[in-house]
């Protein structure tokens, strides 16, 4: 029995030895289970077992004389148990307590367990030990597997930590490299900004060229002379009076002089005496004035603003044709309607000149045609003559002298000269009773005077529109044409 107890309660730490001991224990338990019903007979009382006897005389229990148990764990019979002294005869311990081992008496559980038979205790112990061993083995297997997983996980984490450590160690080097590159980049930007300012401006100027400018530096004297000459030439070439004299070639058509308004004696006097108005130009034969228009007549065509015209309409003659009353129009063509307007105009002087200076002078051919025409003149509209549209001078705010302003200045100078010629021609009409020699002398003198005024005006610097307006206010004779 002692061998069984030693096998069961030996602690086993090694797994292999534990398995071997377990197998041996199982074999012994099987052996005991086979022997107990045949050879090992269970006693009727628990106190009749072989290990229960007196420690001094080795006597077993009986019904009349039961055994006794001391507090020091010794069994004594009635003879050897102390009655008065409380000293154990086996161990000599003092002050002991004694209890009778009787079946009828209920013993405490902690005392009764000492007298339980061993096979049931071993079986229960085996079951308990088997249960505990299985639980412990499973727990060990679980922790073993978990430990393996944790080892693998730790190995992976170790690799990650190693890589992170390498990256952290390289971050300091990379930060230094970034700072170096940023410093180089900033230096390059500053240098490019300081050096690249001029090229960008030059490129901007190359892409966007400045706008073209107009050259205003012109020789005034040469330009005025050229424009004055060209204007006079154009006026001579495009003059309706000159063209009409060339086209007619001395032919005379019947006119309507008999039906002209009677309130215009000066105009009728001019129509009746056309040869009075001719002033020979310098260097030409006075006898040739019948074929060419007079300079005074050409000059008077630009000075028609002195009269307040009442527009008229020229009716057709007996032959079904309009009277050949030609005057300059806007485009230089011939218009008979405009000369009819001029012929029927009421001549009202607007300047301090004499009334005789306001007479309209026409070429001989046109005067004859108007004198012999018998068609009446009736007023229809109030439109300004289209022949004077070219001679309008527009007012501009800009005082800079352009090409158009220079032309208007030359026109104003020509108007001034034409005013003198007009006054001279009117004086010649008033003094028609004088001898022809005096008329020729006076016409020559007036022609020279107009030439001198033309030259002086050509040499003068170009005038602005404000200057012309100021001069017109001072002298109504040089009024601008609007």
Swiss-Prot record:
Induction: Expressed during meiosis. Keywords: Chromosome, DNA damage, DNA repair, Meiosis, Nucleus. One of its GO terms (molecular function) is SUMO transferase activity. Residues 240-249, 418-437 have a biased composition (Low complexity). It is found in: Nucleus; Chromosome. GO terms for cellular component: chromosome, centromeric region; condensed nuclear chromosome; nuclear chromosome; site of double-strand break; synapsis initiation complex; synaptonemal complex. It comes from the Eukaryota. Residues 250-263, 440-453, 463-473 have a biased composition (Polar residues). Residues 239-263, 418-482 are annotated as: Disordered. One of its GO terms (biological process) is regulation of synaptonemal complex assembly. Component of the synapsis initiation complex (SIC) necessary for the synaptonemal complex assembly. Stabilizes the ZIP2 component to the chromosomes. The SIC complex loads onto chromosomes and nucleates ZIP1 polymerization, a molecular zipper that acts to bring homologous chromosomes in close apposition, which is required for meiotic crossover. May also be involved in double strand break repair. Component of the synapsis initiation complex composed of at least ZIP2, ZIP3, MSH4 and MSH5. Also interacts with ZIP1, MRE11, RAD51 and RAD53. PANTHER family: RING FINGER PROTEIN NARYA-RELATED. This is Chromosome stability protein 9. It comes from Saccharomyces cerevisiae (strain ATCC 204508 / S288c) (Baker's yeast). The lineage of its organism: Eukaryota, Fungi, Dikarya, Ascomycota, Saccharomycotina.
């Amino acid at each position: 029995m002692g061998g069984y107890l030693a096998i069961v309660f030996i602690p086993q730490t090694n797994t292999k030895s534990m398995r071997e001991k377990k197998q041996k224990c199982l074999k012994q338990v099987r052996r005991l289970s086979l022997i107990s019903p045949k050879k090992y007979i269970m006693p009727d009382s628990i106190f009749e077992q072989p290990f229960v006897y007196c420690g001094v005389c080795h006597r077993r229990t009986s019904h009349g004389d039961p055994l006794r148990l001391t507090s020091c764990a010794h069994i004594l019979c009635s003879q050897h148990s102390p009655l008065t002294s409380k000293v154990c005869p086996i161990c000599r311990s003092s002050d002991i307590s004694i209890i009778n081992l009787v079946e009828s008496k209920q013993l405490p559980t902690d005392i009764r367990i000492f007298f339980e038979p061993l096979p049931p205790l071993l079986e229960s112990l085996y079951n308990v030990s088997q249960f505990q061993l299985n639980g412990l083995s499973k727990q060990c297997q679980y922790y073993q597997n978990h430990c393996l997983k944790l080892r693998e996980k730790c190995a992976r984490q170790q690799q990650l930590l190693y890589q992170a450590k390498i990256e952290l160690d390289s971050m300091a080097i990379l930060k230094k490299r970034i700072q170096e590159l940023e410093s180089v980049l900033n230096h390059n930007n500053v240098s490019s900004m300081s050096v690249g300012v001029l090229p960008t401006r030059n490129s901007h100027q190359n892409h966007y060229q400045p706008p073209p400018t107009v050259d205003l530096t012109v020789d005034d004297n040469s330009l005025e002379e050229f424009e004055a000459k060209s204007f006079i030439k154009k006026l001579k070439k495009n003059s309706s009076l000159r063209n009409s004299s060339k086209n007619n070639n001395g032919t005379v058509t019947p006119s309507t002089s008999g039906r002209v308004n009677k309130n215009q004696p000066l105009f009728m006097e001019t129509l009746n005496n056309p040869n009075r108005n001719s002033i020979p130009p310098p260097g030409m034969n006075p006898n040739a004035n019948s074929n060419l228009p007079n300079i005074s007549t050409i000059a008077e065509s630009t000075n028609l603003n002195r009269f307040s015209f009442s527009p008229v309409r020229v009716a057709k003659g007996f032959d079904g044709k309009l009277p050949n009353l030609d005057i300059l129009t806007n485009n230089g063509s011939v218009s008979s309607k405009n000369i009819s307007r001029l012929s029927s105009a009421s001549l009202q002087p607007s300047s301090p000149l004499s009334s005789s200076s306001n007479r309209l002078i026409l070429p001989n051919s046109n005067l004859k045609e108007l004198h012999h025409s018998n068609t009446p003149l009736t007023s229809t509209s109030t439109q300004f003559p289209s022949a004077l549209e070219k001679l309008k001078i527009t007012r501009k705010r800009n005082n800079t002298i352009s090409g158009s302003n220079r032309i208007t200045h030359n026109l104003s100078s020509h108007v001034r000269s034409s005013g003198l010629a007009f006054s001279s021609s009117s004086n010649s009409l008033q003094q028609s009773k004088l001898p022809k020699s005096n008329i020729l002398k006076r016409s020559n003198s007036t022609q020279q005077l107009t030439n001198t005024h033309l030259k002086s005006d050509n040499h003068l610097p170009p005038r602005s529109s404000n200057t012309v307006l100021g001069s017109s206010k001072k002298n109504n004779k040089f009024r601008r044409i609007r």
